């Protein structure tokens, strides 16, 4: 089954999305938005002209350079996932598709490509249970992460405004509106924060390796089979050379950092 590719029109939509995000982003001051947009367009051109795994990796490197200074964008992550998938690096593809999800929660192309990468990954493990808060805070997939942050901030500002009006005008109805705005903003902010923490602790194996019971070559293997490309796991701790993680369905183990992407 072929990976769902972006049409020319959809690719142009990505460019526009990227340009707008870059203009309004304050997360990266060292690189100007124009430079990021040029790198993004160049990466798309490299992807379209690619005929080998190395060509797709060249596109991926161009996209990685955009993210190197902390900039985040759903279109960049999505296309980075596409480039790694075509290069045969399924673990990195899965990781970047998942990073794109909070920015494009209802993108059917993204979801289809993620599922295809998961199916192709030789090291795929059992899916962990959904966090409890995704059931309680049920709007988790309704809005993108930036939208949640903006709505949370607006809710807090509305709450402050209504509280001020309550003091000035002495009307109980305004107090109820203030409480509602405060609760709504707090709930959205909490969900955005929990989602961010969950993403920060996600890792994936990028090449076959044996997990160990400790941080040294003399320790026993943690599992009876090697971990392979695409094995996702929860990062529990990390040192300069090793990562300790929980691998769903098989247990906990240490792996060297060169086999881990996060």
Q: For each predicted feature, which ranges?
A:
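SH3/SH3-like beta-barrel superfamily modules
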Residues: 227-257
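Boundary regions of SH3-family modules and the immediately adjacent low-complexity/disordered segments
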Residues: 184-210, 215-222, 246-262
């Amino acid at each position: 089954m072929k990976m769902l590719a972006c049409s020319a029109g959809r690719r142009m939509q990505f460019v526009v999305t990227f340009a707008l995000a870059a203009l309004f982003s304050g997360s990266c001051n060292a690189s100007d938005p124009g430079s990021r947009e040029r790198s993004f367009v160049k990466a798309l051109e490299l992807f379209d002209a690619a005929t080998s795994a190395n060509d797709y990796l060249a596109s991926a490197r161009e996209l990685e350079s955009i993210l190197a200074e902390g900039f985040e964008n759903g279109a960049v992550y999505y296309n980075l996932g596409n480039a790694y998938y075509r290069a045969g690096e399924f673990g990195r593809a899965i990781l970047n598709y998942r990073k794109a999800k909070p920015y494009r929660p209802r993108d059917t192309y993204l979801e289809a490509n993620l599922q295809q990468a998961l199916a192709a990954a030789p090291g795929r493990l059992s899916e962990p249970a959904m966090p409890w808060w995704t059931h309680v805070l049920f709007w988790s997939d309704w809005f993108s992460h930036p939208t949640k942050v903006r709505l949370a901030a607006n809710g807090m500002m509305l709450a402050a405004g209504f509280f001020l009006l309550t003091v000035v005008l002495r009307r109980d109805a305004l107090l109820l509106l203030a409480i509602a705005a405060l609760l709504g903003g707090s709930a959205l902010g909490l969900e955005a924060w929990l989602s961010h923490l969950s993403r920060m602790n996600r890792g994936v194996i990028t090449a076959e390796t044996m997990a160990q019971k400790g941080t040294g070559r003399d320790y026993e293997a943690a599992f009876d089979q090697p971990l392979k490309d695409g094995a996702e796991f929860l990062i529990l701790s990390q040192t300069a050379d090793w990562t300790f993680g929980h691998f769903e369905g098989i247990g906990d183990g240490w792996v060297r950092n060169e086999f881990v992407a996060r």
